[in-house]
Regions:
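Extreme N-terminal, non-catalytic leader segments
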Residues: 1-25
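P-loop (Walker A) phosphate-binding loop of NTP-binding proteins
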Residues: 31
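Conserved glycine(s) of the Walker
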Residues: 35
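Short beta-strand-centered segment that lines the nucleotide-binding/catalytic pocket of NTP-utilizing
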Residues: 49-62
Length: 190
């Protein structure tokens, strides 16, 4: 079953109305160029809260080993994301965001994000099993291959499109399939 935006928003609102002071963590995973960032921004605009981007958690240079890059779901720094984002949020603490910057893949301080009850984690690999399911809600956003190609071409250009097609899209698809990501998420109509 695919949910509408309003149905997803209503579910998030219900979690936020709980008297419980625990954080509401929402994950938005799915294909690259499917609309994850757009969905996160819309939820934030309508409901408030924070948005954290998995794209800030690329592997650093020293982590880019053959073994790590062969690992299903291994081309994101899931250890650092859990330590720097998920663990502080579960304790109701602010989060210091250090983005991994191209082309040298070194960490650069970006900002400190104050704690809010609603925290939206968006990006491929946001539902990685390493995180031990900290989310109240997991959403999967999907786009067909042709739509992906057109959006990536427009957003990233022809040269990067080839890298997406040959490298990143196959890695994502392997992660979705082997870790049953889509099956463990609500799916949204975009």
């Amino acid at each position: 079953m695919k949910y509408s935006y309003d149905e997803i928003k209503n579910l998030v609102e219900k979690y936020m109305q709980d008297e419980d002071e625990s954080p509401v963590l929402i994950a938005i995973d799915g294909n690259c160029a499917a609309g994850k960032t757009t969905l996160a921004a819309r939820l934030q605009s309508d409901l408030g809260g924070n948005v954290f981007h998995m794209d800030d958690y690329y592997l650093q240079s020293f982590q880019r080993t053959k073994e790590r890059l062969r690992e299903t779901g291994g081309n994101v720094d899931y250890e650092r994301f859990k330590k720097e984002v998920i663990e502080p949020l579960k304790k109701g603490e602010a989060v210091g965001v250090y983005a991994c910057i191209h082309p040298d893949f070194v960490l650069e301080y970006r900002e400190t994000i104050e704690y809010k009850k609603l925290n939206i984690i968006e990006g491929s690999y946001s539902c990685h099993p390493y995180f031990d399911s900290p989310y109240k809600l997991q959403i999967f956003v999907e786009a067909g291959f042709e739509v992906q190609v057109e959006r990536i071409r427009k957003r990233n250009g022809e040269v990067m499109l080839q890298r997406f097609i040959n490298e990143w899209i196959p890695k994502e698809n392997e992660y979705f399939r082997k870790m049953k990501i889509k099956e463990n998420c609500l799916q949204i109509k975009m």
